[in-house]
Amino acid sequence: MSAAADVPRRVTIHDLQLRKRQHRRWAMLTCYDALTARIFEEAGIDVLLVGDSAANTVLGYPDTLGVDVDELLILNRAVARAAQRALVVADLPFGSYQISPRQALQTAIRFVKRAGVQAVKFEGGRRVAEHVRTVVEAGIPVMAHIGFTPQSVHALGGYRVQGRGDDAAAIRDDALALQEAGAFAIVLELVPAGLAAELTAALQIPTIGIGAGPDCDAQVLVWTDMAGLTPQPTPKFVKRYADLRTVLHDAARAFAADVADGRYPDAAHSY
């Protein structure tokens, strides 16, 4: 049997769209390195998003606006090399696609060719519909992102729920425009649960919720939030499934104490 026969079949955008029709929900996590990519795959995570949230969680920026293409390419390469089954999606950073559809295509091509990802994601509604169309027509799947869009945090007046009251119509129009442009899925961030449910029922493509209630076709979290590595407080929508911050703190503290007291390395850990 060839080695290729042992490689698991990769999740595709068509698989995700089929799951919507079958009412089968799925999970996406952010991921920034090879080790966690392998762990998340083994745990059954279907989509790995190499998010621009790496700016905060990995690279120490105060927000997502400062990270650039070259920095994210390194992280995308690591995840794409490790992931054999999960669909890997590259989050395009601020300033790398907004100028024109041509710029969006050029950046998307860089991530597909140089990092080996299977799809790209960028933020915005109707204003980026032509960008989506151009990239999709070139053969690169695009995941859209509407509602609260972190790259527009200053224009939106800070981190707050989008689509309440009269603003709901604009969110609906954005979603329909992006679907028509060819997006294979849409992230709904900080959108009222009722509106997210309405959009999920109306759209033919999957919706991915983050702070958008329980009725989306899928859910996504930043993995450091999900695993309890991020300092508290975290947003209301975050459920902490572990307390890795305490685990790592205690492990590092114990290591330092063992070294200081001469307990490590002992005979069992020496050659």
Swiss-Prot record:
EC number assigned by the record: 2.1.2.11
Cofactor: Mg(2+)
Residues bound to 3-methyl-2-oxobutanoate: 52-53, 91, 121
CDD domains found in the cross-reference section: KPHMT-like (cd06557)
Keywords in alphabetical order: Cytoplasm, Magnesium, Metal-binding, Pantothenate biosynthesis, Transferase
Pfam family, one: Pantoate_transf
Domain of life: Bacteria
Enzyme class: transferase
A GO term from the CC aspect: cytoplasm
Assembly and binders: Homodecamer; pentamer of dimers.
The protein's name: 3-methyl-2-oxobutanoate hydroxymethyltransferase
Protein's organism: Acidothermus cellulolyticus (strain ATCC 43068 / DSM 8971 / 11B)
